[in-house]
């Protein structure tokens, strides 16, 4: 049985807050390159980019972390990114920050390709995870598996307007934890 974790209204309020923060940050910039890292970030990204008033160029790396509730290795496609950002600012939009490895790897790629200031914003940051994002909408316990608002389980539940967890369901990884 699914249990509501964050309502659509709570999510919208946080997206608005993050949009306001990013608008102050990017108010002087002509163009911001926005990189959406994970498939699960798609709805969060769609709502957030519409709140940002600076002109943006959108890029998608199309990564994915999970098969069902089991953590897998991340697979991103950096070939979708420009070869040179010409020192333009880059906004990275992530769904859930776990280990931070994918973001560290992406920051390295972006820096090699001439990115200006890099800002990472995530929908969730797992409690106890390394701080690799400048902004996160919500915190999430390490063992909790969530769906909705773009996040899925085996391709299902992405379309839900709120974020839910399943009662008595926890994530598992290769070592039994995230």
Regions found by a protein language model. Name each.
Residues 1-178:
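PRPP-associated nucleotide enzymes
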């Amino acid at each position: 049985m699914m249990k509501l974790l964050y309502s659509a209204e709570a999510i919208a309020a946080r997206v608005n807050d993050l949009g306001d923060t990013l608008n102050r940050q990017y108010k002087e910039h002509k163009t911001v390159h926005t990189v959406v890292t994970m498939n699960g970030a798609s709805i969060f990204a769609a709502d957030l980019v519409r709140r940002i008033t600076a002109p943006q160029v959108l890029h998608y790396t199309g990564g994915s972390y999970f098969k069902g509730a089991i953590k897998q290795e991340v697979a991103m496609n950096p070939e979708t990114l420009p070869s040179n950002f010409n020192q333009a600012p880059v906004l990275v939009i992530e769904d859930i920050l776990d280990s931070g490895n994918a973001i560290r790897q992406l920051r390295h790629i972006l820096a090699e390709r001439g990115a200006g200031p890099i800002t990472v914003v995530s929908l969730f940051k797992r409690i106890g995870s390394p701080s690799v994002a400048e902004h996160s909408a919500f915190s999430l316990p390490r063992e909790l598996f969530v769906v909705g608002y773009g996040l899925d389980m085996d391709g299902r539940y992405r379309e839900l307007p709120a974020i839910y967890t399943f009662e008595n369901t926890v994530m598992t990884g290769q070592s039994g934890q995230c």
